[in-house]
Amino acid sequence: MRAVLELTRRRARNARFARARAVVGARARAADAQELRDDSKGGSSVDKATSTAAEARETAHTLEGFREALRHGPGFDDFVRGDVAYSVPAPKSLKDKTTRKPAWLKREVPGGERYTEIKSKLRELKLATVCEEAKCPNLGECWGGGDGKTATATIMIMGDTCTRGCRFCAVKTAKAPPPLDKDEPANVSKAIAAWGLDYVVLTSVDRDDIEDQGAGHFRETVQRLKASCDVLVEALTPDFRGEKHLVELVATSGLDVFAHNVETVPELQRDVRDRRANWDQSIEVLKHAKKSGAKITKTSIMLGLGETHEQVVNALKLLREADVDVVTFGQYMRPTKKHLAVVEYVTPEAFKRYQEIAEEMGFLYVASGAMVRSSYKAGEFFLANVIKQRKAKEAAAAN
C-alpha cells in the first residue's frame, strides 16, 4: 500500500513538472515567433532600445518559468533514485545569440588563380599574413586583385603567435612564442619581389618576450625590402611598450608610412585591448614616430563596440593633436564566440558621416566603411600616389 502511494505521489510531481516545462517552452516559442516577426519587418536594423526591451521580457519569462518548475518539480531524492530523467534542450530563444549581420557585410568566398598563387607562395616561404590570422573579410578581394588592381597582402612578421591577448583579436597567443626566424627578412623580400607589388604592408604580433620586442627584426625586414625592389613600405607596428628608442629604430628604417592602431576610443581601451596597451601609450608612439622622421603616420579605429558619437569625435580630435595623418574606420567583426560581442552594426550613413568629420579636421586621408581595415588596398593606392607626388616635388626642389 505504501509503495502504491509513493508511486502516485511521484507521478503527480512529474505531471506538475511536465506542465511547468510546457509553460517555459510555450513562452520561449512565443518569444521566437515574435523575433521572427520582428526580423520580417527589418529585424537586422532594430535599434538597441527595442532589442534590450525584448531581452528583458524574455529574461522575466525565463525566471518565472524556472521558479514554477522549482515549486512543483521533483525533489532531490527523485533525481538521486533516478526516477526522473531530466534532459531538456534549451529553447532557441535562450541560446547564446549572435547579432545578425546586415546585407552590406556579406562577402564572396575567396578564390581564383591570383588568390591561389599568393597563398601557395606564402606557404612555400613559411610566411604568415594578418589577412588569414585575423580572419580579414577582405582577403579574397585583396588577394584576388579585382577590378584590374594589383593584388595585395599584408605580411605578418615575427611569427603567428602574439604575447598579448586583446579581446577582439583572433591571432594565437602565448607567453613564450617560438623564436624569431632569422631567414624571415630575406624570405619576405623574396616574396614581394616575385609578386611585383608597388606597395606592401608589414605588420607583426607583439613580442614582449624578446629584449627589443622585435624592433630590430622589423627594421631589418624593411631595409631588405627597400634594397631588393622598388616598393613603398607601410609598417603597422606594435606599441613596443612605449619605449621610444625602439619606436625610433623602426621609424628610421626607411619606411614610407608608420602605422600603429589605437583600435578603439579612449573610454573603451581597458575593455577591448590587452592590459599592457592603452590610449596614451599609443598616442606617444605615433607622436615619437613623427618626431623621428616618419613622414606619414596612420592609425585605425574599430566601430561597433559600444562607443558613442561624441567619443569617436573626441578621439579624432586627439589624433589630430598628435599630428596623425591618416585614419581608417571599420566595423568590428567578432572572430569567434570567445571574443567580444558586437554591440551594434554601424550603418553606411554613419561611416560616411565620420569620414566627413575627419576630413573637415584636416586628416590627409580617411577611409571609412564597414569592410575597411587598417590595411586595405584602396587606401594603399591613395597613399602610394601621395608618396610618389611628394618624392617628385622633393626631387624637383633638389634640382
UniProtKB/Swiss-Prot annotation:
GO terms for molecular function: 4 iron, 4 sulfur cluster binding; lipoate synthase activity; metal ion binding. Residues 1-30 form a transit peptide. Residues 31-41 have a biased composition (Basic and acidic residues). GO terms for cellular component: mitochondrial matrix. [4Fe-4S] cluster 1 binds at residues 131, 136, 142, 375. Keywords: 4Fe-4S, Iron, Iron-sulfur, Metal-binding, Mitochondrion, S-adenosyl-L-methionine, Transferase, Transit peptide. InterPro entries: Aldolase_TIM (IPR013785), Elp3/MiaA/NifB-like_rSAM (IPR006638), LIAS_N (IPR031691), Lipoyl_synth (IPR003698), Lipoyl_synth_mt (IPR027527), rSAM (IPR007197). Binds 2 [4Fe-4S] clusters per subunit. One cluster is coordinated with 3 cysteines and an exchangeable S-adenosyl-L-methionine. Residues 31-58 are annotated as: Disordered. Pathway: Protein modification; protein lipoylation via endogenous pathway; protein N(6)-(lipoyl)lysine from octanoyl-[acyl-carrier-protein]: step 2/2. Belongs to the radical SAM superfamily. Lipoyl synthase family. This is Lipoyl synthase, mitochondrial. It comes from Ostreococcus lucimarinus (strain CCE9901).
